[in-house]
């Protein structure tokens, strides 16, 4: 009987720990502030808020996705892809629902989390879509080769020329 009681307690504890958790306030607040700033076109201030969220939750996919959206808007496609790659690593562990806004050209979608969780990760789908759009954009716009500047030629004094 003791074994069954212990097993029942273990099952209750494990099922309680598997329940989706609401994002901590110290992460949620800078994410929502950053989103509002991003929507207003205040990208530097928004980046600072998203980086604050990342300092408290290193792989937060909302912060990483939004940093990717800003980087893509600024033409920094490699940076955007790097952020999205990090975001995709743990996105499935974040069941929060979100509100969204699109940038012009529809390259990347910025997302604002809400204090409501779903049964599965909604942000993972957004990240996957953003990665696909970004990779297509990168393939369509190959990098321009960087021109090289040859070194200055050595000047030969006039008396040594032709000898």
Regions found by a protein language model. Give the residues of each.
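Alpha-helical tetratricopeptide repeat
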Residues: 24-38, 65
